[in-house]
């Protein structure tokens, strides 16, 4: 039985992906479930977070968003039985890679998969669904009538975010990074209030948002990264398409929420003062927090169930690439790790 792992070189950030033979899984006991994996979605690995949590080891398992069939359950398992169809996210410290035929996982990381939902849809939506719920419900309190700016709305995460915001009755503004993205966003139903094309570098996001909201500013911003410095000082890998932090602060309305994915965000005293005057809040989107405390377990499972329900009723319509076989996972994962893919990649077994 082969599984995909990654190895990080000691000198630099470069990581290599390798297939390794695995021993058969031990007997399933206590609260653990043995799962036959039917699909596993690929996401970028945050090596920095793993290092900070002292979770580095020579070979680290790859693939966490899994959907599959329960083969066997431990004696204390109460939620599942053999032949149940389930979906979930393996914890950061999982010893088993999701990119493998079978995995062992604690029952508290899984929920039932609705019959209508395909394996690839389930695995491909569960993590982005969780991130969007975290951003729009728990960090910014989305409600009907609010205005929401979703940066890079044509990305896998952005698409789900727009769909949830529309479902909740919010007014959505989004940015497009290319002509294809712009055309994709303009075809959205219900329609997006305004699509701002930032691909040519001429559009002013802040001006467009203030114009669209009658000068009031938006209630919620979900960014896809921001520039912290002027264009001359910014490192080359930071896309010039990203907005500057001052633009985001300018377009925020009174009492607004800025949910950021920029883990190294730095705010100077004038920035903080401007946020203070608006009574606005900055929140950091880190979906790993749900499993860092057992107190959150019930809420976490409710979110996963709700994501699957939204998928089965057609509220969520994910942007998935064509499913690929396991033997192509190594090459595809290298592309995903460099953040070069637009649609969500799913390995189908």
Curated annotation (Swiss-Prot):
One MF term from GO for this chain?
oxidoreductase activity
Keyword Oxidoreductase part of the UniProt annotation = yes
Enzyme Commission (EC) number: 1.-.-.-
Question: Per the database entry, which stretches of residues form a coiled coil?
Answer: none
- Entry GO CC: early endosome
Cleavable signal peptide: none
Checking InterPro entries in the record gives: ADH-like_N, CRYZL1, GroES-like_sf, NAD(P)-bd_dom_sf, PKS_ER
Q: Where in the cell is it found?
A: Early endosome
Q: Which UniProt keywords apply?
A: Endosome, NADP, Oxidoreductase
Q: Which family, according to UniProt?
A: Belongs to the zinc-containing alcohol dehydrogenase family. Quinone oxidoreductase subfamily.
Subunit record text:
Component of the FERRY complex composed of five subunits, TBCK, PPP1R21, FERRY3, CRYZL1 and GATD1 with a ratio of 1:2:1:2:4, respectively.
Function per UniProt: Component of the FERRY complex (Five-subunit Endosomal Rab5 and RNA/ribosome intermediary). The FERRY complex directly interacts with mRNAs and RAB5A, and functions as a RAB5A effector involved in the localization and the distribution of specific mRNAs most likely by mediating their endosomal transport. The complex recruits mRNAs and ribosomes to early endosomes through direct mRNA-interaction.
| Protein name listed in UniProt | Quinone oxidoreductase-like protein 1
């Amino acid at each position: 039985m082969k599984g995909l792992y990654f190895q990080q070189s000691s000198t630099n950030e470069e990581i290599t992906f390798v297939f390794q033979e695995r021993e058969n899984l031990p007997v399933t006991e206590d609260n653990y479930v043995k799962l036959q994996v039917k699909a596993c979605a690929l996401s970028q690995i945050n090596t920095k977070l793993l290092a900070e949590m002292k979770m580095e080891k020579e070979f680290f398992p790859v693939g966490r968003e899994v959907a599959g069939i329960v083969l066997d359950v431990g004696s204390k398992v109460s939620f599942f039985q053999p032949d149940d169809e389930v979906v979930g996210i393996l914890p950061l410290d999982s010893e088993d890679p999701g990119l493998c035929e079978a995995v062992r996982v604690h029952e508290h990381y899984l929920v039932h998969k609705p019959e209508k939902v395909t394996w690839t849809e389930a695995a491909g939506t569960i993590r982005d669904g969780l991130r969007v719920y975290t951003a729009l419900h728990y960090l910014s309190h989305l409600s009907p009538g609010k205005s929401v700016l979703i940066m890079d709305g044509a990305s896998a995460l952005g698409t789900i975010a727009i769909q949830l915001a529309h479902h909740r009755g919010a007014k959505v503004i989004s940015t497009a990074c290319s002509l294809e993205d712009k055309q994709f966003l303009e075809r959205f139903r219900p329609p997006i209030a305004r699509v701002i094309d930032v691909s040519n570098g001429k559009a002013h996001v802040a001006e467009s948002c203030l114009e669209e909201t009658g000068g009031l500013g938006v209630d919620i911003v979900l960014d896809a990264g921001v520039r912290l410095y002027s264009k001359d000082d910014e490192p080359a890998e930071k896309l010039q398409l990203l907005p500057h932090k001052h633009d985001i602060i300018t377009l925020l309305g009174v009492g607004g929420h800025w949910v950021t994915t920029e883990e190294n965000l730095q705010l100077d005293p004038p920035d903080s003062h401007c946020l203070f005057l608006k009574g606005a809040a900055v929140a950091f989107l880190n979906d790993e927090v749900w499993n860092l405390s057992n107190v959150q377990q019930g809420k976490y499972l409710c979110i996963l169930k709700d994501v699957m329900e939204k998928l089965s009723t057609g509220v969520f319509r994910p942007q998935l690439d064509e499913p690929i076989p396991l033997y192509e996972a190594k090459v595809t994962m290298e592309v995903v790790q460099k953040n070069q893919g637009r649609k969500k990649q799913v390995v189908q077994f």
